[in-house]
Amino acid sequence: MSKQILYQDDARKALEKGMDILTEAVSVTLGPKGRNVVLEKKFGAPQIVNDGVTIAKEISLEDHIENTGVALIRQAASKTNDVAGDGTTTATVLASAIVKQGMRNVAAGSNPMAIKKGIEKATNFVVSKIAEYAKPVEDTTAIVQVASISSGNDAEVGKMIADAIDRVGREGVISLEEGKSTSTSLEITEGMQFEKGFISPYFVTDLDRMEVLQENPFILFTDKKITLVQQELVPLLEQIAKTSKPLLIIAEDIEKEALATIVVNKLRGILNVVAVRAPGFGDRRKSLLEDMSILTGGQVITEDAGFSLDTVQLDMLGKARRVVVTKDSTTIIADGHEATVKSRCEQIKRQIETSDSLYEREKLQERLAKLSGGVAVIKVGAATETEMKDKKLRLEDAINATKAAIEEGIVPGGGSTNVHISGELFVWAKNNLFEDELIGALIVQRALTYPLRRIAFNAGDNGAVVVEKVKTNDFCIGYDASNGKIVNMYDAGIIDPAKVARSALQNATSIAAMVLTTECIVVDKLEA
């Protein structure tokens, strides 16, 4: 296919146009008075969402060059979502603001590389200030506030997430399930999560979220490497195919040929199966597999116990209520083995007491926390499927934001932290930077006010006026868009996780700086 090549200003303007389209679609959702966006789906009902990264993933333009701009800014949103789980709309608005101002300066003759350096120095300054101002999360109130804001100002959801964290611990696992009623409820179940994901993306059942979801699966635990499918696995796969239930395989590893056979079975619809590598190494791996087998009422297929894969029967497999596997983690939600789990926990406690090694004690405590903490399951209730999807996205944001707040602390929300720091950045840049580097830093300084401007605009207020009002007040004072008043953000419960604020800025400036230093674009030429 022949290529189309654009240079200099033409290249940057085409990228900017694509960015503008995406930013406008995403920024209408910003703030408590942000609106929803309807997404048409190839299959099923349209989806109504208020989530920046979900909207960004759906936008694809006819013009190849503009679409490149969309893809670049989408990257800022996706990366922020991966790191912090929230703040995707803010990242998009910031990236767009930096690009727009940077374009003007580059067109006026500024050096793009020097501007990029200035942007990077300004970002480092702001990130250090966010860390300096961040308050650690010490009580349940702050958790409720963060979760409420991220779920679209839903205080009930905030309380539920705080309750879940209270019951499974700050490192605990919170899982989302579709409920059977119209109300959302919380349930604590036996379960555990470990940091290993699916071996092959062909196992994925939910392509939107890139995860494997299995209801009531069998689970095969083995510390062996699976190599010979015909002898080792086929007898078991045939038994499971008759039950029509899914299968989760947790093994040391699976050889390419064996993996190919399992994948083919999955793709042909013969068996809903997913394979995961076992966590840990050596003896620790065996112990973790034993923990999981006790949790699910199964047995570890190991030669030490005289078992081999070709003789496995269904009653030797574990059973779970639900399994969720992503590219990085596996969550097993089990039921009804309380007595055996309790005695296993007692056994681990005794090992902790008798162990001399600090490292070993740490690992044993980790195992105990995984096994005894359980999993908090939030059953999402809604009247329609469309509402259900929207609620799940909001709850996911709220859970991620809460965990981010626990990690790095909280700062005043609603865009006010960025506005206050922009004043300090202006003074610092004037004293420390010169020429085009100063221009780069001042671009970031002005861009920092854009999220608040947009929140005010979405609430029907004048963004520039609101920004000036906030600037002249103390750091904890900001704009409450739900009632249009200037308030103490901590007292009003309008707070953001510092990690979200930091990630949004870092990813936005990274993408924007790359766009500003672009001098040429090569894309496929559309055939007439």
UniProtKB/Swiss-Prot annotation:
Localization recorded for this chain is:
Plastid, Chloroplast
Check the record and name the SUPFAM superfamilies matching this protein: GroEL apical domain-like (SSF52029), GroEL equatorial domain-like (SSF48592)
> Which EC class, in a word?
isomerase
**Could you give a single Gene Ontology term from the biological process aspect?**
protein refolding
Pfam families, sorted: Cpn60_TCP1
Give the superkingdom in one word: Eukaryota
Q: Which reaction does it catalyse?
A: ATP + H2O + a folded polypeptide = ADP + phosphate + an unfolded polypeptide
- What residues bind ATP, as annotated? T29, L30, G31, P32, D86, G87, T88, T89, T90, G414, D496
Q: Keyword Protease on this protein?
A: no
The record's principal subcellular location, in a coarse class, is: plastid
Subunit structure of this chain's protein: Forms a cylinder of 14 subunits composed of two heptameric rings stacked back-to-back. Interacts with the co-chaperonin GroES.
Q: Which PANTHER family match?
A: 60 KDA HEAT SHOCK PROTEIN, MITOCHONDRIAL
Q: Which family does it belong to?
A: Belongs to the chaperonin (HSP60) family.
Function, please? Answer: Together with its co-chaperonin GroES, plays an essential role in assisting protein folding. The GroEL-GroES system forms a nano-cage that allows encapsulation of the non-native substrate proteins and provides a physical environment optimized to promote and accelerate protein folding.
Name under which the protein is recorded: Chaperonin GroEL, chloroplastic
Task: State which gene encodes it.
Answer: groEL
